[in-house]
């Protein structure tokens, strides 16, 4: 239940949730780049990675609840919920910026979570 509350807060906050820490994140990235982190690890990369990670638990939770053989429902749930969030941002949150890239990253996260559930189940079955 706490996960759902966090997901809703992050997705439906009136302004981008990273806005208060954007300057700090940019400074941290500059510092990391000065120490050898590749240039492609930029603000956009961090934002996309956060979108992926945010939906991993969703895919896993749905796959666990639905049961064996239907792991893909976790992935589908991620796609549908992400589309609903982006539509809500478009229609009701003028301070937010809905994008297809967010839908793709969120869906990837849900797929990874669902596949992780599948992998754990298979390992448990194979264990003596």
What are these regions (language model features)?
Residues 47-50, 103-108:
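Alpha-helical transmembrane segments of polytopic membrane proteins
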Residues 1-96, 114-128:
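Bulky hydrophobic segments
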